[in-house]
Amino acid sequence: MEVASLYRRVLPSPPAVEFASAEGKRLFAEALQGGTMEGFFNLISYFQTQSEPAFCGLASLSVVLNALAIDPGRPWKGPWRWFDESMLDCCEPLHKVKAEGITFGKVVCLAHCAGARVQSFRADQTTIHDFRAHLTRCASSQDCHLISSYHRSPFKQTGTGHFSPIGGYHAEKDMALILDVARFKYPPHWVPLTLLWDAMNTTDEATGLLRGFMLVSRRSSAPSLLYTVSCGHGSWKSMAKYCVEDVPNLLKDESLDNVTTLLSRLVESLPANAGDLIKCVIEVRRKEEGESSLSKEEKERLFLKEKVLQQIRDTDLFRVVHELQYPKGLCGSCSSSSDEDSLAEIAATVCCQGAAFLSGNLVSRDGFCCRETCIKCIEANGDGLKTVISGTVVSKGNEQAVDLLLPTSSSKTSLCNSNLKSKIVKYPSSTDVLTVLLLVLQPNTWLGIKDENVKAEFQSLVSTDNLPDLLKQEILHLRRQLHYLAGCKGQEACQEPPSP
């Protein structure tokens, strides 16, 4: 039986004014003359329609990130780096967003994970006068864009909660231009700012919190290279609680009389799925027939990731953590069988995810089976050999070959043309992740250590003051991500964390 279909909706007017109408054009011309349409041109250049009915938040953010010319640092399709909804999955699995939509706080988290600077305000954390001032500032600049989270009912539109970028502002008429990403439903339209405020001042039933708006702009520093904070797994909540609440409480124990004991207690108390919070960013590309080298940009990205990885392993904290995890004196070039199994599992999982995304399946890797994986070395355009994991993924009888560009630290062991488990690979390991996690926690976390000597020694180990610049930027970015993750799930405004 054929399901009834719809072809667009008639825009209720009033209260809205269609952008392409005679009145809409007049409002545009007057606002342009008034200087409050400066952000419009970049937004309209990268404006897109949401690809799924519940992808309004992802589409709005994708438009804004591309308008700000923020480089995602990884390919979208072919050689092209470009923000697409499929790449905005660090804070919520795409299949869940497709089924349920996405909350205000998760969109804020996504924007930050993507490398943007974000200020967010729920309606009860600001005023309509402040909102008007923020919108005027953004509309008068090409460097900042505003995304609104609102309910459609005040505009007499069908539907419920929605996200869209605001493309401009008419100061005299006090009207805002909504660039509705659901273009299959409503065209861009002008609405009274007071009505938009009412639409944001509504409760999202999924969270019990009010909707609001966020200001998105470029950062002066680059986003993280090797790791990212992820809340795509349900276990992130227990890990966030561990970082923010459990660790400070644990440090009150007066029996923690040396750094080794302190670290042991921290490791023993880690939640079972601690590794789900901080994830390594692994680049996946479709393997083209006859392709046997890395491009200049792929080589540069891999080089920077390897540099960060090596800088992590050069820290005193890594040495202490490694000695704690391998008390029998395993050398730095050694790896346990569990590490090898972990690499094999990671390779198979990422190969399937990558193949699913590259084939256009944005929400699930079900039906994708990784038949085999192997390690090889390929030429990096005359700059030596780089380690790549190749995998063959099977889906519905069709095979797809993919490559994982794997950052590794220096090793004397040859990896070329080896089976995945036949050689030892110094890939990002659990020791690296634990080291990063300890560095990422806010400095005031450790103030509760009772023994002053232990406190001083431990604070020296986790201090970012003497870290190399590349690693320091990585840690500070992850620290901001964790701050957003902990703060945006509750009543607090998702503002910038305190300076280190």
UniProtKB/Swiss-Prot annotation:
Tissue and organ distribution: Expressed in roots and shoots.
InterPro entries: Papain-like_cys_pep_sf (IPR038765), PCS-like (IPR040409), PCS_N (IPR007719), PCS_N_sf (IPR038156), Phytochelatin_synthase_C (IPR015407)
PROSITE patterns to which the protein is assigned, alphabetical: PCS
Pfam families according to UniProt: Phytochelatin, Phytochelatin_C
GO BP term, pick one: cellular detoxification of cadmium ion
EC number: 2.3.2.15
Regulation: Requires cadmium for activity.
Catalysed conversion reaction: [Glu(-Cys)](n)-Gly + glutathione + H(+) = [Glu(-Cys)](n+1)-Gly + glycine
Active site: 56, 162, 180
Induction info: 5- to 10-fold by 100 uM cadmium.
Keyword vocabulary terms for this entry: Acyltransferase, Cadmium, Metal-binding, Transferase
Family named by the database record: Belongs to the phytochelatin synthase family.
Listed name of the protein: Glutathione gamma-glutamylcysteinyltransferase 1
Organism annotation: Triticum aestivum
Lineage: Eukaryota, Viridiplantae, Streptophyta, Embryophyta, Tracheophyta
This protein's encoding gene: PCS1
